[in-house]
Amino acid sequence: MKKLLSIISLLFFVTTFSAKAEMGIGITAAAHMVDGSGSETTRTSGQVNNGSHDETAVIPEVFVEAIDDNSGLTVGISYIPVRDIGSKSRTDSNSEGDSGTYKADAELNNVFQIYADIPTGSLGSFPIHTKLGVQRVTVETLESLNSGSEYPNRDLLGFTVGLGTKGDLPFGNNLYYKGELTYTNFETYEAVSTAGNKVVADLEDVAAKLSVGYKF
């Protein structure tokens, strides 16, 4: 409930701010470097299996934002339909009847982010802004386990911080660009499978983003 109230409060702020500012819409190409690590504890033996996985992918996203003409402060919402965070397999051989290949796979679905770009200075002729954001994602598990067990999907929050620059493009008064480098740390995913095994996983994301927008 506290998470939902926080998101509603941020949405209210974005809506109120946008009524007093210039609007912008655009698309982003982002190179994501995802780092995931976790452990699975089996119910029957208590064995702990640790693992980690890195994944790199270029993923598009769309955004709409409100830009204050006086201060340059920008608040907005971005959306990614789906983001694959990779898969990993292992092969076990034991006497409990569940020997075989185990494949863990997951996606981040419906990635919504509420963010603020806060002007913080300049580097030469390039203005610099600090990005602060909150993401809401659905972790959809797509595992293929020889034991037949499944893990539930979970909704998580991610907290983003980054630096960027922006400016007008020379192709018209209404076109602009943004370049950003961001870091996101997601809440810990914890779940118990249908077979009683427990998994705990942490996820981090570093992204380099290039955006093109249109102001109106």
Where are these regions (language model features)?
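Outer-membrane beta-barrel "beta-signal"
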Residues: 22-26, 31, 163, 169, ...
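Gram-negative (and chloroplast) outer-membrane scaffold detector with strong preference
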Residues: 60-145, 169-171, 208-214
